[in-house]
Amino acid sequence: MCLSRWCIGGVSVSYVLIFMSATSENNKRIAKNTLFLYMRMLLIMGVTLYTSRIVLQVLGVEDFGIYNVVGGIVALLGFISSSMSISIQRFLSYEMGRKNYEKVSRAFSMALQIHGIIAVVVMMLLETAGIYFLRCKMVIPIDRMDSALSVFHCSVLACGFSIVQVPFIALIIAYERMGLYAYIGIVDTMLKLAIAFLLGWIAYDSLALYGGLMLVATIVITLAYVMVCHLSFKEIRYQCIWDTRLFGSLTRFASWSALGEMAWGFTLQGVNIVLNLFFGTVVNAAY
């Protein structure tokens, strides 16, 4: 028997209204987040197409191809952080749903430490095996090898910073702050557009300069993610801990998506490298 004055099927009307209000708020949040993501995607897509055209004009076909294929070597190992990102978002979102912010902090701290280790390992692999492959196997003109090596070193450092970004991006997405995510993505795109214009104004080796400026842009965006998370999510703080059980859970969950991410990465970048081995940098510029 329902004790409330107004009941529908034995359920208090007040509870129904609360549920409807919560559902309405959720729908509004989903719609707003979707709008932010679509705006981000469209703006980034448009600006990137325009930026690529400018960079191609400034660098020339050969240097543009060198940058693409050198960056492709670095990007081959990007599947590791991509697969971990999905795992981190899952654990952060689960603990947030339980309002257990202590465990959210622990999961975030573990994720940050894991990605720090991944960044170091990936950079070491690239600076050893990657350098050998670039020098001995890739088809790059002799007079552009020094510039290609400069781009490679900058790309390796940028890769390390990009890997460290992943836990902060996962935290923003877990909090459903898509506006912040969209704004930082737009700033990143604008920085790359500014770099494209700067290339034509600075009298220096354009290929090496482009690699260095792209590294600076990656560092700036990484710092932006760190500052935004520090200021916006005060209940989440880094803890210097090591939870073996949580480490196992994160890596096991990530292993399910690692194979797909690896296949996708090798499909995109592996073809680029194979094209270079057989046809040279001009074909890489067209790929």
Predicted regions and their residues:
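Helix-terminus/linker motif at the lipid-water interface of multi-pass membrane proteins
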Residues: 46-64, 135-139, 200-202, 265-287
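Small-residue-rich midsections of specific transmembrane alpha-helices
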Residues: 45-51, 68-96, 112-122, 159-165, ...
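Membrane-interface junctions at transmembrane-helix termini in multi-pass inner-membrane proteins
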Residues: 27, 157-187, 208
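Alpha-helical transmembrane segments of multi-pass membrane proteins
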Residues: 128-131, 141-165, 194, 219-220, ...
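Interfacial/gating helices of multi-pass transporter permease domains
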Residues: 55-76, 107, 207-212, 246-257, ...
